């Protein structure tokens, strides 16, 4: 049985001081034999987090697909690997909306991360307009097709997919657990076509979108939802513990 994989995403929040306080409150209250708990923090906090955390996987929130060069403000896989980062979020809807990132960009990032033995958390999800037009599955599967293009199955099983409907991120709106399960099920079916059933079963699929301690359990009991990617509800230590220890 796969361990559930629950990651918080602090986005552009926090300080080294607040992260230190946060980890002092949560790290020794997580049983890493039962769950994979993680936290994506701003770049300037990565080393603090990596130094202090024993049971929380510290992740970066983005990476560039080039290894070096004239890309002001960007960060490379080599730089993240040097400080010990093992997980990186790529393709978050905020990156897509604000910085015009595409599925092809995400595909390039996924490849370079996997080549360097870093786990990409690959985000996908539809807008409200796409949902209302009844094209969610078609849209999300097209994203998956592009983002996994050219990735071998032995690498694909190391990736994590985070299904985050854009209309549910930070809005307080949530997909019902059955709706989220249906999309995650179709993502897995699509992965079976790209690779094979065994490969598809091994790939972790998270749900994200206004997940909080009060509703996480109903999502994680679904057969095709292997974890959660959580934004605002991961900022407070008490809420974070309510998420990662949801089953206690």
From Swiss-Prot:
Substrate binds at residues 9-11, 170, 210, 231-232. Pfam families: TIM. NCBIfam families: tim. This is Triosephosphate isomerase. Homodimer. Keywords: Cytoplasm, Gluconeogenesis, Glycolysis, Isomerase. It is found in: Cytoplasm. Signal peptide: none annotated. Its EC number is 5.3.1.1. It is an enzyme of class 5 (isomerase). It catalyses: D-glyceraldehyde 3-phosphate = dihydroxyacetone phosphate. The lineage of its organism: Bacteria, Bacillati, Mycoplasmatota, Mollicutes, Mycoplasmataceae. InterPro entries: Aldolase_TIM, TIM_sf, TrioseP_Isoase_bac/euk, Triosephosphate_isomerase, Triosephosphate_isomerase_AS. Pathway: Carbohydrate biosynthesis; gluconeogenesis; Carbohydrate degradation; glycolysis; D-glyceraldehyde 3-phosphate from glycerone phosphate: step 1/1. The gene is tpiA. GO terms for molecular function: triose-phosphate isomerase activity. One of its GO terms (cellular component) is cytosol. One of its GO terms (biological process) is glycerol catabolic process. Belongs to the triosephosphate isomerase family. The active site is at 92 (electrophile), 164 (proton acceptor). Involved in the gluconeogenesis. Catalyzes stereospecifically the conversion of dihydroxyacetone phosphate (DHAP) to D-glyceraldehyde-3-phosphate (G3P).
């Amino acid at each position: 049985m796969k361990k559930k994989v629950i990651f918080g995403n602090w986005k552009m929040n926090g300080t080294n001081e607040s992260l230190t306080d946060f980890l002092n409150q949560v790290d020794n209250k997580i049983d890493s034999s039962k769950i994979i708990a993680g936290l994506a923090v701003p770049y300037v906090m990565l080393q603090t987090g990596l130094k202090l955390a024993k049971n929380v996987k510290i992740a970066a929130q983005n990476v560039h697909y080039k290894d070096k060069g004239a890309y002001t403000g960007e960060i490379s896989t080599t730089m993240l690997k040097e400080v010990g980062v093992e997980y990186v979020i790529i393709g978050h809807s905020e990156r897509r909306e604000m910085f015009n990132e595409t599925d092809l960009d995400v595909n390039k990032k996924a490849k370079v991360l996997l080549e360097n033995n870093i786990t990409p958390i690959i985000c996908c999800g539809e807008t409200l307009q796409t949902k209302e037009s009844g094209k969610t599955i078609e849209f999300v599967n097209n994203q998956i097709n592009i983002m996994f293009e050219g990735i071998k199955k032995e690498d694909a099983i190391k990736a994590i997919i985070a299904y985050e409907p854009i209309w549910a991120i930070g809005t307080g709106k949530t997909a019902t657990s059955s709706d989220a399960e249906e999309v995650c099920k179709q993502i897995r079916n699509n992965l079976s076509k790209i690779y094979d059933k065994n490969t598809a079963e091994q790939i972790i699929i998270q749900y994200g979108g206004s997940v909080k301690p009060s509703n996480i359990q109903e999502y994680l009991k679904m057969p095709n939802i292997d974890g959660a990617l959580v934004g605002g509800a991961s900022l407070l230590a008490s809420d974070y513990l309510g998420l990662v220890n949801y089953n206690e």
